[in-house]
Amino acid sequence: EEMLNFENYRDVIDDNFVEEIYQSSPLHDIGTVGIPDMILLKPGKLTSEEFEIMKMHSAIGGDTLRAADKEAGQHSFLTMGRDIAYCHHEKWDGSGYPFVLKERRIPLPARITALADVYDVLTSKRPYKEPFSHEKSKTIIEEGRSTHFDPDVVDAFLARENKFILICKSNQSTDELSPIQQVVQMIG
């Protein structure tokens, strides 16, 4: 929602875009169904070989949603979901995967979801880590400005910081929206 206020995105972001990204962003990690549980649920750091396998989830998810989109007759929800699944691990500086895209070559929904996903991971308990505070997570995101993240998406995140603090606090106690849906809805 915040990026509706950014002049250079007015031709791309409207209420329909916000609704579609809200609906399609939870598909970002759908490709993890193709990753062995011993890697997904590993309590410690992944080996380099395990990480290479884990990275395959982006292509698996994107391919799955591309096939579903083709079968369903090109629905914008699935097209956006496909772009997000493929590209949510791309980085602004071109050091991400699977396509090594950079800057505006990364689809906007994927750039927004990338930050939301990182915030969700940082502030959530995982098999390999305890949740970080909002402040620590914010610092990590700010440090990733113009390297990991689109600077405009970081600006949108910071403009809605008070709402992110609330998400962080309720992260483990709500069954309503997933944390990533809450984050994406506010940024987009």
Model-predicted regions and their roles:
Residues E1-G188:
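Histidine- and acidic-residue-rich, metal-dependent catalytic cores
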